[in-house]
């Protein structure tokens, strides 16, 4: 399965050097690129985002454009004090209103040092993303005890964790393949002015049925 022609955006909600959110996200990004799909990784540590209520910065406008043009988004967050990071919240705030996430499939990845993982962070982040109109994928990945699962170079030491994170990436690609690609192809087909789709429909069994018989 390939989703060529689409671009995804990946965001890690931590600005700490060597943070585990970025290490986990890198596995998902690698899986996406293995499938020949372009993905733009937004480094929030290098972005100068605006505080809510202030005019958008140049970086905010650039990020809005990247997200608006993306087919889907992966958000990775650490769990801080029972919720997602303020960095991710500021990222979402800088996407404007209506949000750049509106109508887009979003995959969520959470990491935490504790035994229960980032369940609370993901629950809260799901609610916010849904509130701004994102299509949040049902499956999320919560990584518990993350400090034991990655080495300093970013290599994952646990095959099961790596499989789950890569699976999140493929879930997003599968969603795009099954739901976004066919719609985009049909829209392009219709915009081209071609009438071939009408001929195909006219030759189908459904075309011969009178209205009210379905």
Positions of the model-derived regions?
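N-terminal beta1-alpha1-beta2 submodule of the flavodoxin-like/Rossmannoid cofactor-binding fold
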Residues: 1-97, 160-173, 180-214
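Residue-level signal for beta-strand positions within conserved beta-sheet cores that form or flank
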Residues: 4, 35, 102, 137-139
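Glycine-rich NAD(P)-binding loop of Rossmann-like domains
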Residues: 5-7, 101-103, 151-157
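A broad detector of the eukaryotic-type serine/threonine protein kinase catalytic domain
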Residues: 13, 96, 106, 110-111, ...
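Mobile beta-alpha loop/short-helix "lid" or hinge segments that flank ligand
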Residues: 39-50, 97-99, 132-152, 179
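Short, charged/polar low-complexity linear motifs in solvent-exposed/disordered segments
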Residues: 120, 126, 154-155, 169-170, ...
């Amino acid at each position: 399965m390939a989703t060529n022609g689409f671009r995804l955006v990946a965001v890690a909600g931590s600005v700490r050097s060597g943070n585990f959110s970025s290490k986990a996200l890198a596995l998902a990004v690698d899986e996406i690129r293995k499938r020949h799909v372009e993905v733009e990784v937004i480094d929030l540590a290098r972005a100068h985002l605006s505080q809510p209520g202030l005019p958008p910065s140049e970086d905010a406008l650039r990020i809005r454009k990247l997200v608006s043009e993306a087919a889907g988004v992966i958000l990775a967050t650490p769990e801080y004090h029972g919720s997602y990071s303020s960095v991710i919240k500021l990222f979402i705030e800088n996407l404007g209103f209506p949000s750049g996430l509106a109508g887009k499939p979003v995959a969520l990845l959470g990491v935490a040092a504790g035994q229960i993982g980032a369940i609370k962070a993901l629950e809260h982040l799901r609610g916010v993303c849904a509130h701004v109109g994102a299509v949040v994928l049902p499956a999320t990945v919560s990584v518990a005890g993350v400090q034991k699962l990655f080495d300093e170079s970013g290599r994952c030491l646990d095959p099961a964790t790596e499989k789950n994170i890569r699976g999140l990436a493929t879930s997003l690609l599968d969603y795009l393949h099954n739901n976004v690609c066919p719609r985009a192809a049909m829209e392009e087909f219709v915009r081209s002015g071609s009438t071939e789709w009408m001929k195909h429909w006219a030759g189908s069994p459904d075309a011969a049925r009178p209205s009210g018989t379905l």
